[in-house]
Amino acid sequence: MHILEQRIRNAHAEGRTALIPFITAGFPSSEGFRTALADLDSHGADTIEIGIPFSDPVADGPVVEEASRRALAAGVTLDGILKELRAHPCLRAATVLMGYLNPILQYGTEAFARDAAAAGVSGCIIPDVPLEESAELRALLKERGIALIPLVAQNTDEARMRAYAAVSEGFVYVVSVMGTTGVRNSLPPQVLDTLRRARAAFPLPLALGFGLHDPAQLAAIPEDARPDAAVFGSSLLRHLDEGKSAASFLELWKK
């Protein structure tokens, strides 16, 4: 069993939803990022999703986009992110990199797979790599024990879900809304259908993201559709930008 799947299964065995916070590398500052990473790791994050800043983040909402802009302006690079992660070899939480293909191509796909593995990365989410174009990169990552995480949404049909299921490991990222990331007051009713269809198509645990900001949103989801993990980013980034700690934010999700 892949480590990302194991972390979520372990949380389920403890009777809880796995927590996957998202933070942009280098945000709100280099030191602030290091502190947030350590706080999330020591306060119960099962997996930490780390955003690779990019100048044209098509799947990201305004909060994540602004965090990326500020990180890029501060000189954050993919090489620097991997070096930073190598400096934290004792993280309890698993780590997943979320980014776009262009920086990875510039880095070199083979070098990226090698160096990401050396940095302890367990998974990658790359929204602009469709299934049909993912085989080579998926194979390079898999050789290093890194899962390429699939994203599914309300417009992903059953045939495509099954095609993803045939090659995927780790977990499935279920997108709660059409469009970009960001805080929403409520989840659309269509997400229940997406979760149920994904549950039927995949043997892997489901992580729900895009728009989550309150544990009450999860509690409102019927048991038969409830995800195994929650991904939250924009609300955490706002919390950090206000000078508050990642630890205090995570405690809100553990209550």
Language model features with spans:
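Short beta-strand/loop segments at the ligand-binding rim of alpha/beta enzyme cores
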Residues: 14-20, 90-100, 141-151, 199-211
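Conserved, mostly hydrophobic/aromatic
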Residues: 21, 40, 51, 116, ...
